[in-house]
Amino acid sequence: MLAPASKARVAHARRLHRRTFRESAGEFLAEGPQAVREAVAAGAVRELFLASADAARHRALADDALAAGARVYDASDAAVTALSGTTTPQGVIAVCARVDVGPEVALGTAPRLVAVLVAVRDPGNAGTIVRTADAAGADAVVFSPESVELANPKCVRASTGSLFHLPIATGVEVAAAVALARLSGMRVFAADGGGDHDLDDELDSGGLAAPTMWLFGNEARGLPTELRALADAVVRVPIHGRAESLNLAAAAAVCLYASARAQRARR
């Protein structure tokens, strides 16, 4: 039998919708069975709220959370609605501890594939890139200071649990990230639609087989000149049809998977 969620615990969790409170508490909300399952596995869950109607269905998840030391509550429909960031709550909401790490942790273990988000402002794009980096086997993701907050609810949802799978460093200056990459012997590529290097050519020539850091710029402005200059090459994704361009998350997926393919072929 789960303890009922008190008004005080619901109020605390609800305040995590505000960035200032997330930062001061060192906590954020994850919602949905998949994301929460990954959070529990990572040991990040502090509190778990289960809708009364769904508690029996998610009993295994509740047991895992309890075994990991989390507090698990039976929550009313009103409480779940208040905590949810969607119009159709899934009935599973967790208060999680911050998961971001310092750049030395994320980049200090000879990584082979890293994605750097440079002033990426759309949380859906950011979360999707985290998910894609995880799927492609990347070793880390880095957020620049100007990028959207990793714990933004839309970013957390878009990552679908992947933010609990790999090291993510936030608030890192791009020049500092590149410097750490150089110490590890990585090549640095800047993704840009106007780049003078073609991704297919880099793939065919073996240029992507080396350990690689990708820089992905702002959705509207791309990468500034001074950051493009830090890269070994500015690379464009070829457009073979009539589309004007790819959106940021799609372009990042193509680039990351091209690197992953080249690196697997070399092994």
Question: Which residues make up each language-model segment?
Answer:
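N-terminal positively charged helical leader segments and presequences
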Residues: M1-T87, G185
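Short glycine-rich anion-binding loops that position phosphate/pyrophosphate groups of nucleotides
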Residues: P33, A53-A55, A78-A79, V99, ...
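RNA substrate-binding interface of SAM-dependent RNA methyltransferases
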Residues: Q34, C96, D100-G195
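Short beta->alpha connector loops at strand-helix junctions that form conserved
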Residues: A51, A75-S76, V118, S144-P145, ...
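Generic beta-sheet signal
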Residues: V92, R112-A115, A210-G217
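Structured adenosyl-cofactor binding patch, chiefly the S-adenosyl-L-methionine
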Residues: A94, D134-A136, S147-L163, T225, ...
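Active-site/ligand-binding-proximal alpha/beta "capping" segment
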Residues: F189-A243
